Amino acid sequence: MYEEPYRWVEAVGNRRQYLDEQFKQGSPVVALTYDGGILLTTVSKGTPKLYEIYDRLALGGMGHPTDLEKLRFSLLEMAHVEGFNRSPSDVTGSRLVKYGIAPVIKQAFEEVYKAPFIVRILVAELGQKPEKDALLTINYDGTFEETTGCAVLAATPVAQTKMTAYLKEQTPATLSLEQGLDLSLRAWAIGSLAHQQEESDQRAEAEPTKTGAGSSTAAIPSADVLMEHVRGIAGGRTIECAILERQAPGTSKYRALKPADLSRLLPKALQSVVVS
């Protein structure tokens, strides 16, 4: 009887290791506020990772497509029930995360005899004014964080930290959609390269004959190098972008950027990888 709490703690630790492993091949997600609203960007393998949730709410995700789809439908249902029973203005990202989806993810994670959700989620909320914009991220254990300006999902905490630091350092006072897309893709490349570097460092540490292993403090690559990395990866994938547009007509502010939009907005080095 006295061993049960320790077994539970050990089981939770094992679940963390298992879940961390599942995200190693995941594609980062970047959310960034720009002059006209909020931009979400990722590079997907075919299954969409960006969705509309409600009039002023968007979702980005990493993880197992089935789990992501299940939670997306849960968010959709919660948002529309809330909007019907109360009012559309009461449907906020904060309420949906804090009182809706985060407790569900937390419960699944802590029930060690059931499968957890293999997901990391980003919820973007477009405010009536720019200062009211909100970005929320939820980890696979149900913990969440609310930020402004930018937010990311990444394979590892190290990659996430590097992406966030890069965005905060590179974001100017004013940012057009075209500039925001360029910056988001560079931040995506930072996350992708950071994870590759972590794996390289781990392999080097496992080979004691090699010296000079570990380069986690390496300088940030130039913009050209970052874009070349995106170009190399995106050739077999899809650059996926969506915006919450403050001045869009109607109640729904969500719009997925089509290939024609991307061909106009992407840097010249990447325009050839957009497939209509």
Segment roles from a protein language model:
Residues 1-276:
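Long, low-complexity N-terminal extensions
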